[in-house]
């Protein structure tokens, strides 16, 4: 699974996931499914934000990369992917500026158009079950919840899906692609089932010993939203050649 993650996701997303697991004292060599889940969640959050801006009239518009406008403001503030201290600093700043209610748990995004925090969920199970779990944990009507599944289903607070259909379809397609690529490598069952995951982990560790010197192909594309995080953790030279486009897992 670890090899798959490094092949399928952009190196910047992988690096953020590694830092997140390290911050919580988790070993990605052991918890490979969580490593994959974190990378997937990060990518969905960035794709959610991609290309969405607010113009001078306060209207939400979509602007593709290559059509810049200095007067435009990003519609979404990305909170996910930051270290906890910085994330809470951003949340506090938003609350002080907008008067929004401070959430009990760190949300993933803030929507400046709708003036609300957003919790993004990506589930391998039924969307309604995961939605209820999120709602019970957050216990706040102020935080908007939007759940995606690997089967193309989604569920959101009051059926308000925030994004246009095309933007959501891009996210669903990416998730379906990840599922297909996992399945083609025999990883999907272990990603869904904890019991199967333990068996797969033993197999992976044994395989890593045999293939430690094998070269690995890496996707070099990235989400434009990642560039917003860039100053915090990497220099611009490493992102200069990355194209902002929808990621696709490379074939073996």
From Swiss-Prot:
Q: Pfam families in the record, alphabetically?
A: Flu_PA
- Source taxon at top rank: Viruses
The active site is formed by 80, 108
Give the site residues for Important for efficient shutoff activity and nuclear localization: 195, 198-199
Keyword Nucleotidyltransferase (UniProt): no
Positions in coiled-coil regions: none
The principal localisation class reads host cell
* Residues covered by region (Disordered): 202-221
Comp. bias intervals (Polar residues): 208-217
Q: Where in the cell is it found?
A: Host cytoplasm; Host nucleus
Q: Tell me the GO molecular function terms.
A: RNA binding
GO terms of biological process kind:
viral RNA genome replication; viral translational frameshifting
Q: What UniProt keywords are attached to this protein's entry?
A: Decay of host mRNAs by virus, Eukaryotic host gene expression shutoff by virus, Host cytoplasm, Host gene expression shutoff by virus, Host mRNA suppression by virus, Host nucleus, Host-virus interaction
Q: Which InterPro entries match?
A: PA/PA-X (IPR001009), PA/PA-X_sf (IPR038372)
Q: Does the keyword Glycoprotein apply?
A: no
Annotated site residues (Important for efficient shutoff activity) in this chain: 28, 65, 202-203, 206
Quote the record's domain comment: The probable endonuclease active site in the N-terminus and the basic amino acid cluster in the C-terminus are important for the shutoff activity. The C-terminus acts as a nuclear localization signal. The C-terminus is recruited to host protein complexes involved in nuclear Pol II RNA processing.
Q: What does this protein do?
A: Plays a major role in the shutoff of the host protein expression by cleaving mRNAs probably via an endonuclease activity. This host shutoff allows the virus to escape from the host antiviral response. Hijacks host RNA splicing machinery to selectively target host RNAs containing introns for destruction. This may explain the preferential degradation of RNAs that have undergone co- or post-transcriptional processing.
Q: Which family, according to the similarity comment?
A: Belongs to the influenza viruses PA-X family.
What name does this protein carry?
A: Protein PA-X
The gene is PA
């Amino acid at each position: 699974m670890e090899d798959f993650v490094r092949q399928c996701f952009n190196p910047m997303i992988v690096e953020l996931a590694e830092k997140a697991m390290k911050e919580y004292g988790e070993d990605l060599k052991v918890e490979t499914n969580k490593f994959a889940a974190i990378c997937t969640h990060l990518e969905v959050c960035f794709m959610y934000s991609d290309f969405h801006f607010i113009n001078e009239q306060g209207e939400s518009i979509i602007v593709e990369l290559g059509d810049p406008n200095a007067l435009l403001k990003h519609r979404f503030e990305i909170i996910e992917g930051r270290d906890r201290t910085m994330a809470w600093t951003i949340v506090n700043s938003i609350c002080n500026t907008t008067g929004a209610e401070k959430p009990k748990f760190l949300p993933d995004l803030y929507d400046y158009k709708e003036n609300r925090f957003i919790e993004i969920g990506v589930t391998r199970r039924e969307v309604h079950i995961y939605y209820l779990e999120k709602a019970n944990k957050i216990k706040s009507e102020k935080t908007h919840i939007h759940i995606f599944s690997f089967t193309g289903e989604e569920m959101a607070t009051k059926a308000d899906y925030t994004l246009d259909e095309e933007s959501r379809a891009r996210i669903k397609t990416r998730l379906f692609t990840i599922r297909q690529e996992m399945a083609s490598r025999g990883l999907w069952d272990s990603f869904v089932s904890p019991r199967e995951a333990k068996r797969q982990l033993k197999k992976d560790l044994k395989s890593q010993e045999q293939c430690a010197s094998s070269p690995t192909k890496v996707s070099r594309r990235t989400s434009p939203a990642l560039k917003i995080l860039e100053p915090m953790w990497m220099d611009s030279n490493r992102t200069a050649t990355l194209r902002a486009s929808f990621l696709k897992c490379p074939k073996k």
